[in-house]
């Protein structure tokens, strides 16, 4: 067995069943092995399109995307889409290959890592065959948990080397974060509940994290309990389309009527949302509101802007349910006039 076959095995064991690719010297043997193992390939005319396709696939299906480009000039073509995927927190593995490590000259040889790192992604050079399986497993685990693209570069002469040490080259199971892994501190929930109780015009802003966690019922229940209006970030548009107190999309794409309502809010509860500048219209959308950020990775500062006053590190669904249980029933501004 060749190493490129074992690498393909690990990818398949991690659930990769589709790959977006443009082939060349450094990735064609691996791609052939992936195809033989039943992986469906979507071939593109440009490397940018391959990575963009994998990013869209990852976002649509909620799984790790897979793309592949050849080394050197194949890799440099993804420098536009790669930072986009980084900033969108898209989990993705990009198999790029590398120039042969056993040659002193190769016409497509460049130092690939600085290009990738400059985009904010990580570059893992697969040069140590003794730890190859661990390196690939670590990349999949990090892409999943940190929601980020990782580029794997493996010299194609190493890919074609034979080996017999199959046990070392097996996939490790990725531990998926669930509510059982989350320790909701009672003090934080109590503080948040107090802020919600004091609010007269709260708004719940749900993002893709709420969609992924299937937290819509929990968000609706929290809104009904706290008297809050409902809204979403642009990527989560339509989540509350069937709810009567729905403001629609927040930010620059909000309707004028919704913007007028947002401007009066005194508390925003971000649930599974990034609290990006666009979602708050650069801070102009809710100028007088405090912000609670409920997310697996909550942040006080986002894109150089103060974004939240209270951070709740929790799964969107179970965090919203915990808040609902802690909040006393109140009308807020859920009145007939607001329909």
PLM features per residue range, with description:
Residues 17-55, 60, 68, 184-185, ...:
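Anionic-ligand anchoring segments at beta-strand to alpha-helix junctions in alpha/beta enzyme folds, i.e.
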Residues 138, 142-198:
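Conformationally flexible catalytic loops at phosphate/diphosphate-handling active centers
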Residues 21-23, 94-96, 153, 228-234, ...:
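Short internal beta-strands
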Residues 2-3, 130, 153-154, 166, ...:
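Phosphate/pyrophosphate-binding active-site segments
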Residues 39, 90, 227-228, 286-290, ...:
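A short helix->loop->beta-strand "cap" motif at the edges of active sites that frequently abuts
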Residues 27-29, 49-53, 73-82, 86, ...:
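Short glycine/serine/threonine-rich phosphate/pyrophosphate-binding segments
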Residues 108-146, 264, 309, 319, ...:
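Conserved thiamine diphosphate
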Residues 251-302:
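Phosphate/diphosphate-binding loops
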């Amino acid at each position: 067995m060749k190493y490129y076959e074992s690498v393909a095995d690990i990818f398949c064991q991690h659930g990769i069943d589709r790959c977006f690719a443009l082939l060349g010297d450094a990735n064609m043997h691996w791609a052939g092995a992936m195809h033989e193992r039943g992986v469906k390939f979507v071939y593109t005319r440009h490397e940018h399109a391959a990575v963009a396709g994998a990013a869209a696939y990852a976002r649509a299906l909620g799984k790790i995307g897979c793309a592949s480009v050849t080394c050197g000039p194949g890799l440099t073509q993804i420098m536009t889409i790669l930072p986009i995927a980084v900033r969108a927190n898209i989990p993705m593995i990009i198999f790029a290959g590398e120039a042969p490590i056993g040659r002193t000259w190769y016409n497509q040889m460049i130092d690939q890592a600085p290009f990738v790192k400059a985009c904010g992604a990580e570059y893992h050079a697969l040069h140590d065959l003794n730890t190859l399986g661990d390196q690939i497993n670590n990349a999949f685990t990090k892409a999943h948990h940190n929601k980020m693209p990782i580029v794997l570069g493996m010299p194609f002469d190493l890919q074609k080397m034979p080996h017999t040490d199959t046990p070392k080259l097996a996939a490790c199971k990725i531990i998926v974060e669930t509510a059982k892994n989350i320790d909701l501190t009672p003090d934080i929930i109590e503080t948040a509940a107090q802020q919600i109780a004091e609010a007269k015009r709260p708004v719940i802003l749900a993002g893709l994290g709420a969609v992924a966690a299937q937290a819509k019922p929990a968000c609706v229940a929290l809104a009904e309990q706290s008297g809050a209006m409902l809204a979403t970030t642009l990527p989560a548009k339509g989540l509350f389309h069937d709810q009567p107190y729905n403001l629609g999309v927040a930010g620059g794409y909000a309707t004028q009527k919704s913007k007028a309502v947002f401007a009066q809010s005194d508390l925003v509860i971000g649930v599974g949302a990034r609290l990006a500048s666009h979602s708050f219209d650069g801070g102009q959308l809710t100028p007088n509101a405090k912000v609670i950020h409920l997310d697996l990775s909550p942040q006080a500062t986002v894109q150089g802007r103060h974004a939240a006053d209270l951070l709740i590190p929790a799964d969107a669904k179970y965090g919203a349910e915990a808040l609902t249980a802690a909040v006393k029933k109140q009308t807020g501004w859920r009145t007939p006039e607001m329909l």
